[in-house]
Amino acid sequence: VVSVSSEELSALAGVGPAKLRKDLSHLGSYGVRGVGYDVTMLAAEITEVLGLARDWPVAIIGMGNLGRALAAYRGFATRGFKVVAVLDHDERLVGLRAAGLVVQAMADLPALVREQGLAIGVIATPPESAQDVADQLVAAGVRSILNFAPVVLSVPGGVDVRKVDLGTELQILAFLAQQRTVPTTRTAEVS
């Protein structure tokens, strides 16, 4: 495919063509009226703007079930993220292997940030450890954190945190499922 129209792209994205054109214009991509968007150029622009033109080195902290599963997840590599380090504070786990990497001690974090250029830290620890891990990541120079622990982290300005709360996501799905099963007589009672 050499080019794609805004109508085709909007159908794939689930948005209207005008919204898609407006959003793409913010990237500096305007397309050609009647021709569409050059697929190769558009993909390159989006990749560059999203910061995916390079591999981002990632460390996963917490080698329990979730941390090991995240370390083994192959989808990161296809999206420009390379897990270069796995760490845990539990000395019984240090030195073991997880997803082909040797589990390192938290004391090694500052050196790993310097040597590996770690850009992103993933917290997969119990909630009571998460804030301490976040503090250590920030002190070592990491400015992007993905937090799987069910707690709100306190970090200084200039540090980006994204929280993944699987329990909340399940609650949202339960709510939506409940809405589909609520009898229609309930709305009649309100009327």
Task: Provide a role label for each language-model segment.
Residues L66:
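Hydrophobic/small residue at the entry helix of a nucleotide-binding pocket
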Residues R74-T78, L137-A140:
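Short, solvent-exposed amphipathic alpha-helical segments in soluble enzyme
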